[in-house]
């Protein structure tokens, strides 16, 4: 069902709920006891802790493993990984809030979450520091350069794992892409298809890509986020930037009838580097 933008911003929750799906809480037993606000608040982008849960399921997480949460925003995913798996999480973001240590302490994981305010391209860690890298709704902002995957992989131990979850296009967009799909332009130009991301990491010769697919709830995550934002606060109570973003997402969903705009997950394991022979031809 399409959303009637002619009524924007004077919309009712009945219309919102009839137009967009909500991710069912029962599909995520690890989030039992969480409110929908706790699943979404403090997280940029779509998917909330639903997407974080699915990403974590791909990793081999247990107490004591060292995880780099890269581009963690406010650190909500870092607290989640420490709380549910006992992981020692290094929460890295260049705009990390000062409130993270207190929030981690209140969640009972103050000793497991280490805040690190740093640029993703200038990580202050020695090689082989981590068992896993986790990056949700952030990697496309800094990781599309061909040289970035080899740089990042140096911080993983041998056989260490990496998981990325992010918005994506089902296929690569071209110059004729509908204007509605170019959300957050020009950042959207760094949003790619799962196949693109598979090649991006595989060509390093240093990893085995185990999974690079559209998320089965990829389109649903967009709808669920709109529902939450409008249920949490009516448009007239939003800041102009947020109100405009919600309207832009609705326009995109109205135009996208077959799930071209979605989300993906990539899971890779670091292996022995392939020694490429120089071409002197």
Tell what function each PLM region has.
Residues 1-59:
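Conserved class I S-adenosyl-L-methionine
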Residues 68, 74-122:
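Class I SAM-dependent methyltransferase SAM/SAH-binding core
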Residues 121-132:
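A short acidic, Gly/Pro-enriched loop at the edge of an enzyme's catalytic core
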Residues 132-144:
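A short SAM/SAH-binding and catalytic strip from SAM-dependent methyltransferases
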Residues 146-161:
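A short glycine-rich, Lys/Arg-flanked "PGG" loop and its adjoining helix->strand segment in the class I
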Residues 211-281:
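Conserved Class I S-adenosyl-L-methionine
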């Amino acid at each position: 069902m399409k959303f009637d933008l002619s009524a924007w911003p004077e919309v009712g929750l009945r219309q919102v709920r009839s137009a967009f799906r909500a991710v069912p809480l029962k599909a995520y037993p690890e989030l039992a006891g969480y409110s929908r606000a706790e699943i979404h608040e403090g997280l940029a982008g779509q998917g909330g802790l639903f997407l974080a849960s699915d990403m974590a399921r791909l990793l081999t997480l247990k107490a004591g493993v060292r995880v780099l949460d890269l581009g963690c925003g406010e650190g909500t995913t870092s607290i989640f990984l420490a709380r549910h798996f006992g992981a020692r999480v290094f929460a890295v973001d260049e705009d990390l809030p000062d409130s993270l240590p207190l929030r981690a302490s209140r969640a009972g994981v103050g000793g497991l979450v280490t805040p690190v305010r740093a640029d993703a391209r200038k990580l202050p860690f020695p090689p082989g520091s981590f068992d896993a890298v986790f990056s949700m709704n952030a990697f496309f902002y800094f990781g599309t350069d061909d040289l970035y995957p080899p740089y990042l992989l140096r911080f993983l131990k041998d056989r260490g794992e990496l998981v990325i979850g992010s918005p994506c296009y089902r296929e690569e967009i071209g110059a004729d892409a509908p204007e509605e799909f170019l959300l957050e332009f020009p950042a959207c130009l760094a949003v790619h298809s799962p196949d693109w991301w598979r090649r991006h990491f595989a060509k390093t010769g240093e990893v085995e890509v185990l999974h690079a697919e559209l998320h089965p709830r990829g389109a649903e995550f967009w709808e669920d986020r709109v529902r939450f934002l409008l249920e949490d606060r009516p448009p007239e109570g939003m800041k102009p930037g947020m109100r405009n973003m919600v309207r832009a997402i609705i326009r995109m969903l109205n135009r996208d009838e077959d799930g071209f705009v979605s989300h993906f997950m990539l899971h890779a394991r670091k292996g022995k580097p392939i020694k490429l022979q120089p071409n002197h031809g």
